[in-house]
C-alpha cells in the first residue's frame, strides 16, 4: 500500500505582518510597519494613539471606507503601536447571544478595555540559599545571614522551583510565592550546562519592602467578585450575566484604591468592527456608556454608506444613528491605487515566504483592482499550494488556474443569475 504525505496549510493571519502605524514622530512613511499608503488616515490615528497614551477615554472614533481599504489593518496598527495597553476587538454581530443581553455583552467588552494598575508595597526576603532542610531555610546576603522557618505550602513552592543551596531566590511571604532569580556566581565552576543564569549574591538586608505593580482589567475584577468561584470563570470564559450590584461594589473599591493612591485607571481601546450591525438599542447604550468615568476610547469601523439603522425605519449615514455620529471623530480611508495594492501583496508574499514570478504578481495586482484585495490574497494562497506540488515558484499559469476555479463576487453573482 502506498503511503502519501498529506499537504497541510499553515494559516497566517491576514494582518500578521502589521507591526505599528509606521509613524516616526509626526512623519508618516509611505510603507512602514506593514501599512501602505493611507497617509492622512495614519496621521489621524497617530493623534488617537497620543490620546490613549495620555489616558483620555470617553471618545468615539469612526473609521469609514470601502471593503478592502484597510480599516481593520489601521486598527491593528494602533493596537501594535500601543504595546501593552488594553485593546479589545469585537464584531458588531458578537453582541447578539442567547446567553446574555446586548447591554451585558457591550458592558463586558467595555470593561475588558479598561485596566486597573495596582501599586502594592510587599515585604520580600531575598538572598542566597545557604542550606535547606525540613522546615528551615538559611539565607544570606553579602552583609548578613539568617534562618527562617517555612510551612508546608512554602516548602512545596521551593520544591517546585527546584531550589537548592547556592540559588538566589526571592520569597513573597504574603502571597506564598517563591521566585528563583538564578544561581550564585560563586557556584559557576560547579555547575555544568549553559542554561543556568548566574547572578551576584544580594547586598544589604535580607528582608526589605519593595513596590510591585500589576495590571488587571475591570472585567476580570467583576468576574472574580461575581460568585464564590468567580476566578474559575476567568479560565473557562463562561462568565454569564454579572449583576449590576457587583459592578457597583467593584467600582466603589476601585475608587477607594484610586483615592488612597494604591491604583490608577488605564483606559484602553474597544474596537467594534462592522458597527452598522448594531441596533438602535445598542447605540443608545453606547451613547450613555461614553459619558461614564471608566469608558475607554471606542473605535468603530464600517463600509456602509447611507442605510437603515437596525431596529428602525430611518436611513442614516453609515447605518449609525445621527446622535452617535455627532460624538465621533471620523477617519476616512482612501481607495488603494495600483502601487498600494502591489506593495500590500508584496508584504503578504514575504510574510508567507512564497516564491513568485513578477508576471504572476502583476496579474494578482490587476485582479485586486477589479475584485478586491481579499480575493487576490486567497488566490495567492491557492496558487502557492498548486506550485508547491512541483516544488516550484508561483507562475502566471498557477494564478490563472486558481482564477478559473474560484469565482470572485461579480462572476459568482453572474453565474447564479444565469
Swiss-Prot record:
<comment type="similarity">
    <text>Belongs to the RuvB family.</text>
</comment>
<keyword id="KW-0805">Transcription regulation</keyword>
<keyword id="KW-0010">Activator</keyword>
<keyword id="KW-0234">DNA repair</keyword>
<comment type="subunit">
    <text>Component of the SWR1 chromatin remodeling complex, the INO80 chromatin remodeling complex, and of the R2TP complex.</text>
</comment>
<dbReference type="InterPro" id="IPR003593">
    <property type="entry name" value="AAA+_ATPase"/>
</dbReference>
<keyword id="KW-0067">ATP-binding</keyword>
<dbReference type="InterPro" id="IPR010339">
    <property type="entry name" value="TIP49_P-loop"/>
</dbReference>
<dbReference type="Pfam" id="PF17856">
    <property type="entry name" value="TIP49_C"/>
</dbReference>
<keyword id="KW-0547">Nucleotide-binding</keyword>
<keyword id="KW-0698">rRNA processing</keyword>
<dbReference type="GO" id="GO:0016887">
    <property type="term" value="F:ATP hydrolysis activity"/>
</dbReference>
<dbReference type="GO" id="GO:0006281">
    <property type="term" value="P:DNA repair"/>
</dbReference>
<dbReference type="Pfam" id="PF06068">
    <property type="entry name" value="TIP49"/>
</dbReference>
<feature type="binding site">
    <location>
        <begin position="65"/>
        <end position="72"/>
    </location>
    <ligand>
        <name>ATP</name>
    </ligand>
</feature>
<protein>
    <recommendedName>
        <fullName>RuvB-like helicase 2</fullName>
        <ecNumber>3.6.4.12</ecNumber>
    </recommendedName>
</protein>
<dbReference type="GO" id="GO:0004386">
    <property type="term" value="F:helicase activity"/>
</dbReference>
<dbReference type="InterPro" id="IPR041048">
    <property type="entry name" value="RuvB-like_C"/>
</dbReference>
<dbReference type="GO" id="GO:0005634">
    <property type="term" value="C:nucleus"/>
</dbReference>
<keyword id="KW-0227">DNA damage</keyword>
<dbReference type="InterPro" id="IPR042487">
    <property type="entry name" value="RuvBL1/2_DNA/RNA_bd_dom"/>
</dbReference>
<keyword id="KW-0156">Chromatin regulator</keyword>
<dbReference type="GO" id="GO:0005524">
    <property type="term" value="F:ATP binding"/>
</dbReference>
<dbReference type="GO" id="GO:0006325">
    <property type="term" value="P:chromatin organization"/>
</dbReference>
<keyword id="KW-0539">Nucleus</keyword>
<dbReference type="InterPro" id="IPR027238">
    <property type="entry name" value="RuvB-like"/>
</dbReference>
<dbReference type="InterPro" id="IPR012340">
    <property type="entry name" value="NA-bd_OB-fold"/>
</dbReference>
<keyword id="KW-0347">Helicase</keyword>
<dbReference type="GO" id="GO:0006364">
    <property type="term" value="P:rRNA processing"/>
</dbReference>
<keyword id="KW-0804">Transcription</keyword>
<dbReference type="InterPro" id="IPR027417">
    <property type="entry name" value="P-loop_NTPase"/>
</dbReference>
<keyword id="KW-0378">Hydrolase</keyword>
<dbReference type="GO" id="GO:0008094">
    <property type="term" value="F:ATP-dependent activity, acting on DNA"/>
</dbReference>
<comment type="function">
    <text>DNA helicase which participates in several chromatin remodeling complexes, including the SWR1 and the INO80 complexes. The SWR1 complex mediates the ATP-dependent exchange of histone H2A for the H2A variant HZT1 leading to transcriptional regulation of selected genes by chromatin remodeling. The INO80 complex remodels chromatin by shifting nucleosomes and is involved in DNA repair. Also involved in pre-rRNA processing.</text>
</comment>
Amino acid at each position: 500500500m502506498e503511503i502519501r504525505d498529506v499537504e497541510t496549510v499553515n494559516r497566517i493571519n491576514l494582518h500578521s505582518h502589521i507591526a505599528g502605524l509606521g509613524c516616526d514622530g509626526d512623519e508618516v512613511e509611505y510603507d512602514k510597519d506593514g501599512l501602505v499608503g493611507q497617509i492622512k488616515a495614519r496621521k489621524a490615528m497617530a493623534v488617537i494613539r497620543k490620546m490613549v497614551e495620555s489616558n483620555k477615554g470617553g471618545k468615539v472614533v469612526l473609521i469609514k471606507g470601502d471593503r478592502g481599504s484597510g480599516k481593520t489593518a489601521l486598527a491593528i496598527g494602533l493596537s501594535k503601536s500601543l504595546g501593552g495597553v488594553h485593546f479589545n476587538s469585537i464584531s458588531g454581530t458578537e453582541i447578539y447571544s442567547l446567553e446574555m443581553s446586548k447591554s451585558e455583552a457591550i458592558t463586558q467588552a467595555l470593561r475588558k478595555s479598561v485596566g486597573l494598575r495596582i501599586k502594592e508595597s510587599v515585604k520580600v526576603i531575598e538572598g542566597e540559599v545557604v542550606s535547606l532542610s525540613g522546615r528551615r531555610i538559611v539565607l544570606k546576603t553579602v552583609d548578613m545571614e539568617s534562618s527562617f522557618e517555612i510551612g508546608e505550602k512554602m516548602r512545596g513552592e521551593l520544591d517546585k522551583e527546584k531550589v537548592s543551596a547556592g540559588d538566589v531566590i526571592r520569597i513573597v511571604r504574603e502571597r506564598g510565592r517563591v521566585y528563583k532569580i538564578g544561581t550564585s556566581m560563586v557556584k559557576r565552576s560547579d555547575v555544568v550546562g549553559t542554561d543556568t543564569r548566574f547572578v551576584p549574591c544580594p547586598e544589604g538586608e535580607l528582608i526589605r519592602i519593595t513596590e510591585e505593580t500589576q495590571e488587571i482589567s475591570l472585567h476580570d475584577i467583576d468576574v472574580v467578585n461575581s460568585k464564590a468561584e468567580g476566578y474559575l470563570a476567568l479560565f473557562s470564559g463562561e462568565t454569564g450575566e454579572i449583576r449590576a450590584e457587583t459592578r457597583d461594589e467593584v467600582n466603589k473599591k476601585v475608587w477607594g484604591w484610586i483615592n488612597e493612591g494604591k491604583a490608577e485607571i488605564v483606559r484602553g481601546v474597544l474596537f467594534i468592527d462592522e458597527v452598522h450591525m448594531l441596533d438602535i438599542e445598542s447605540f443608545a447604550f453606547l451613547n450613555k456608556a461614553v459619558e461614564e468615568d471608566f469608558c475607554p476610547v471606542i473605535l468603530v469601523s464600517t463600509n456602509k454608506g447611507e442605510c437603515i439603522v437596525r431596529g428602525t425605519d430611518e436611513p442614516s449615514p453609515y447605518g449609525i444613528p445621527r446622535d452617535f455620529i455627532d460624538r465621533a471623530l471620523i477617519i476616512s480611508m482612501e481607495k488603494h491605487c495600483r502601487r498600494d495594492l502591489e506593495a500590500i501583496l508584496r508584504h503578504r508574499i514575504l510574510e508567507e515566504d512564497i516564491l513568485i514570478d513578477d508576471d504572476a504578481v502583476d496579474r494578482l495586482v490587476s485582479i485586486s483592482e477589479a475584485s478586491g484585495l481579499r480575493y487576490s490574497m486567497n488566490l495567492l494562497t491557492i496558487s502557492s499550494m498548486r506550485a508547491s506540488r512541483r516544488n516550484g515558484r508561483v507562475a502566471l499559469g498557477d494564478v490563472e488556474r486558481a482564477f478559473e476555479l474560484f469565482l470572485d463576487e461579480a462572476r459568482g453573482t453572474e453565474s447564479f443569475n444565469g
